[in-house]
Amino acid sequence: HLLSRRQRQMCIRDSFITKRITRPLERLAQTANRISGGEYSLRTRIDSGDEIGSLSKSFDAMVAELEQQLENRTAFVADFSHELKTPMTSVIGYADILRTHVLDEHDKFMYADRIFKNAKRMENLSVKMLRMLKLSQTEPTLEPVESERIERGIRQMFENGENLDINSEKGIKILCDYNLLLTLLRNLIENALRFSDGQKVIVKIERSGNCCRFGVADSGRGMTQEEIRRAAEPFYKADKSRSAAGYGIGLSICKSICTLFKTELKFESELGRGTCVSFDLEVTE
């Protein structure tokens, strides 16, 4: 039974349409299988201009995001291991000296004190790491909080005579999670005090339109644009030669809390003049 000319044309057309649809889908499926096997750098790169092309672009964007997250996780683990290795090596070294040497009381105390301080460094690092992990699973409890209460909370956290000047506008009701906000402010203030070169750190709480603006300013060395861009990366330190303590985790915690509050950190800095970090929160009546 021979097909008519029209039927043959229809078969050819249908075959062309089928191949046009199935080939990109097969390519997409093959790429997905290879990616599931760990080849995260692969992309489908199907630019057909139709629904399949749109699906391909969304798929490639998703894989790119996944690849970036995996790279960030790998770098995070490597940085954490590096930061933990330094105090751990010190603890092992000083403990070995105490174990294998005959020392007088002064030297015993000196090495024991160094072990204690390095152990506290590791404890501090672990606490901040746990805090970051908890933040990724935290849902903020938003409630109206008066600016006076926030000011009191800051003063209670820094009641040991830190070089701190708090300028808070009265009567502002801020929609926030009070405990998370204090954690955010504590990390910003501690970071500013660390790099203020002994000068006063200024904290401002003031209304700005329909928002309340929180600002923490120091008069330290300032930051370059590259340092600002990377400031909230875990374990990033702008100047590794400085003796200031810290692991570069504080601003990462701040960024995570700002994300929960649906706001962002803003940096204004000038080299040799200092840095101001600010964020806005919604005001409620």
Question: What residue spans do the PLM features occupy?
Answer:
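Amphipathic coiled-coil signaling helices used for dimeric signal transmission
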Residues: 34, 47, 51-72
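Membrane-proximal alpha-helical signal-transduction linkers
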Residues: 20-42, 56, 63
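Single conserved hydrophobic/aromatic residue that forms the stacking wall/gate
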Residues: 1-8, 12
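Short conserved segment of the HATPase_c
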Residues: 223-235
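Short helix-loop "hinge" at the ATP-lid/N-box region of the Bergerat-fold HATPase_c
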Residues: 192-193
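Membrane-proximal coiled-coil signaling linkers
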Residues: 66-117
